[in-house]
Every structure is written in C-alpha cells, then in structure tokens.
Curated annotation (Swiss-Prot):
Identification of the protein by name: Olfactory receptor 51V1
MF annotations from Gene Ontology: G protein-coupled receptor activity; olfactory receptor activity
InterPro entries: GPCR_Rhodpsn, GPCR_Rhodpsn_7TM, Olfact_rcpt, OR51/52/56-like
Glycosylation-annotated residues: N18
Species assigned in the record: Homo sapiens
Transmembrane segments: 35-55, 64-84, 109-129, 149-169, 206-226, 247-267, 283-303
Ranges of the Cytoplasmic topological domain: 56-63, 130-148, 227-246, 304-321
Keyword match Disulfide bond: yes
Record's GO cellular component terms: membrane; plasma membrane
Subcellular location: Cell membrane
Membrane topology: Multi-pass membrane protein
Pfam family, one: 7tm_4
C-alpha cells in the first residue's frame, strides 16, 4: 500500500513541533488489516469486559471489601485504562479510520502508556506487600492495612506513576522532529519520539533510564525479596496442607507479576538485540506488551482466586436466567 502525497508531505522531515506522525501498524500487511482487526477487536473487547467484570464483582460484593481485593481493583482499573489508552489508534489503523496522529495526541498517549506501566508495577509491588503481611504477620493484617492507609497507598501509587514521568514528556513538546515522522508502532512511545527528534535528547534518555531502574527494576527486586520472605515463612509451617494453602493465596499474584514483566523484558531485548527482526515482529512484541497483562489478569484472578471465581460464576448464572 502506497502513501498518499498528502501523507508523505505530513510525515516528511521538518523542524515543526506541530506536525502529524504516521502510525505504521503492521507494515507490509495492510491487505490483511480487515482480518487482523477481528482478533484485535476481540482482544480489546475481552480486556474491557474482563476488567469491568472484576471491578463490578468487587464493588457489589461486600465480602470482597478487603485490602487484597481493593488492590486487585486497582490492578483491574489500571489494565482497563491501558486498554482504553491504545484502543483508538490500534483499532483505528486496522479499521482504516486513522493513519496519522498529531504531536499533542501522541505525547498524551505516550504519557498515559508509560504512566500506566509504572502504575501497574507499583500496584503489583503493593499486592506483594499485602501478601507478605497476610502470611508473615497475619495477626496485625487488619490493623496495618486500614481503609485510610489503603487510600493513601493508592494516591501515592498514582503520584509516583504520573508525577515523575512528567518532565521528559513535557520536553517532547519542545523538540524539533527533523526525521521522517513515521512511528514504528500502532501507538506512541517515548523512545519512538526520541528516535525522530534532532534536538538534544540526553536529558530524556538518561532520565528515562533512571525511571526504569528506580521504578520497574526496583519494584521487581522488592517483589522478589518479599517472596523470599514469604517462602521462608511458608516453609516454617509444620503442616504440609497449611503450607499448600498459604502458597495458593500467592499463585494469582505470581502469575500477574510474570505476565507483566515477561513482555517488558521481551520488548527490551527486542529493541536492544533484535535489529535484524522484521518491523512486524517489533510491532507484535509491542502489542503483546500493551495487551497481554490487561487480557490475562482478569482470567488469572477469575480462575485462581476462589472468591472471584465463585462470584463470576454466580454473575454468569444470573445473566442466563
């Protein structure tokens, strides 16, 4: 599929800070877009429906108004927002509605994508902390995780996720973009815009690396450390049945952590060492990074968490009758 003359003009090199950017999508597979739109539309529908159902079950069931499920609702809300932040551009390309995005819209989308990624990492860390207290210090669980403290934790997560990424995102607005305005994904990422800029991007590059280390890497280390302490506490329990029961309460969270971090590591490795891979492979990994956690988390918690599983079945049985 060839670009129109108007589109070529809009994505040509310029020093304007108000130009449009071309969203490439699955380059070279434009003829298959109508077919690709079917699975992607289904995935987005499952993301939105699954996370809304988790939120609905927790909201309407008084017995689930506990710290563990409050944190799960934060995770579901984060996943829901992640799906909403990319649905317009991803499906817009596949449906033939859009091919371009303005700089302001691109910056806003990258802000929400990266902010929500940091937020998901923070929520997963908080859920690990919740499991640590529940297993290692159960007698003080309710006194430590009070409702007021949970609200403060939630506000801290939001502030931590979106405040610290503001400086590099604001800088994107004032860069000159003198390379061809062609993005390598179906959505906007900070590193994609940096690649097109001809301004001094050292601050953004170093700052972004610092954020990855201080948030994503630090969270992963703290989650691992919390599970080392949890495992030590579980192994100290004499009864094998009790050990199994305690470990079962952590299975869902462990799966959610793997579902979040494996795509991030894969995307990082592809960007770092996958220069020989086709553009389609890069776009596919990018979409897995965006869509896999929001798709899988409702499934994981609906299957592995007994309270959610029971109420989901009850919800579907009510809808049938």
């Amino acid at each position: 599929m060839f670009l129109s003359s108007r589109m070529i003009t809009s994505v040509s090199p310029s020093t304007s800070t108000n130009s449009s950017f071309l969203l490439t999508g699955f380059s070279g597979m434009e003829q298959q877009y109508p077919w690709l739109s079917i699975p992607f539309s289904s995935i987005y529908a499952m993301v939105l429906l699954g996370n809304c159902m988790v939120l609905h079950v927790i909201w309407t069931e008084p017995s689930l108004h506990q710290p563990m499920f409050y944190f799960l609702s934060m995770l579901a809300l984060t996943d829901l927002c992640m799906g909403l932040s990319t649905v317009y551009t991803v499906l817009g390309i596949l449906w033939g509605i859009i091919r371009e995005i303005s700089l302001d819209s691109c910056i806003a989308q990258s802000y929400f994508i990266h902010g929500l990624s940091f937020m998901e990492s923070s929520v997963l860390l908080t859920m690990a902390f919740d499991r640590y207290i529940a297993i290692c210090n159960p007698l003080r669980y309710s006194s430590i995780l009070t409702n007021s403290r949970i609200i403060k934790i939630g506000l801290t997560i939001i502030g931590r996720s979106f405040f610290f990424i503001t400086p590099p995102i604001i800088c994107l607005k004032f860069f000159n973009y003198c390379h061809f305005h062609i993005l390598s994904h179906s959505f906007c990422l900070h590193q994609d815009l940096l690649r097109l800029a001809c301004s001094d991007i050292r601050f953004n590059s170093y700052y972004a690396l610092m954020l990855v280390i201080c948030i994503l890497l630090l969270d992963a280390i703290l989650i691992l450390f919390s599970y080392i302490l949890i495992l030590k506490s579980v192994l100290a329990v004499a009864s094998q049945e009790e050990r199994h029961k305690l470990f079962q309460t952590c299975i869902s969270h462990i799966c959610a952590v793997l579902v979040f971090y494996i795509p991030i590591i894969s995307l990082t490795m592809v960007h770092r060492f996958g220069k020989h891979l086709s553009p389609v492979a890069h776009v596919l990994i990018g979409n897995i990074y965006i869509l896999f956690p929001p798709l899988m988390n409702p499934i994981i918690y609906s299957v592995k968490t007994q309270q959610i599983h029971t109420r989901m079945l009850r919800l579907f049985s009510l809808k049938r009758y």
